């Protein structure tokens, strides 16, 4: 059963664009040869890292979204781990996240807004305040 995953990885900032493309192509080939499908590939560019990773303060971020089964994802992670140019990676299973978000949306849609409901009892108008009486000014001599 294929599941939906996001694989974010960071490659060294000193790599040429062609080398980055080769790494991406080899990972895409791993997924397709293993029976998975690539939904999208996004190069997010060079960004500053929050902390030093293998003595690098910057890295090129790449996001792969794939449909794959568990053993294929394990193989993909193994290849990321042994590729020296990859300095960091994370794999997140997104189908559970989609289910959770859809459930929250359904709950929110089923709720009726307080502003949409008619008021149960219209507020009674307060009685008008009695008119202020004029004070008679004292006669000055």
From Swiss-Prot:
Q: Name one GO biological process term.
A: translation
| Annotated region (Disordered), positions in chain | 110-141
Instruction: Tell me where on the tree of life, at the top rank, the source sits.
Output: Bacteria
Q: Under the cellular component aspect of Gene Ontology, which terms does the record hold?
A: cytoplasm; ribonucleoprotein complex; ribosome
Keywords, comma-separated and alphabetical? Ribonucleoprotein, Ribosomal protein, RNA-binding, rRNA-binding
Per UniProt, what is one GO molecular function of this protein? Answer: structural constituent of ribosome
InterPro entries, alphabetically? Ribosomal_bS6, Ribosomal_bS6_sf, Ribosomal_S6_plastid/chlpt, Transl_elong_EF1B/ribsomal_bS6
Query: What Pfam families has UniProt attached to this entry?
Result: Ribosomal_S6 (PF01250)
Question: Which residue windows does the record flag with biased composition (Low complexity)?
Answer: 117-141
Q: Which HAMAP family match?
A: Ribosomal_bS6
Give the family this protein belongs to, as stated in its UniProt record.
Belongs to the bacterial ribosomal protein bS6 family.
This chain's function reads: Binds together with bS18 to 16S ribosomal RNA.
| Name this polypeptide is given | Small ribosomal subunit protein bS6
Q: What gene does the UniProt entry assign to this protein?
A: rpsF
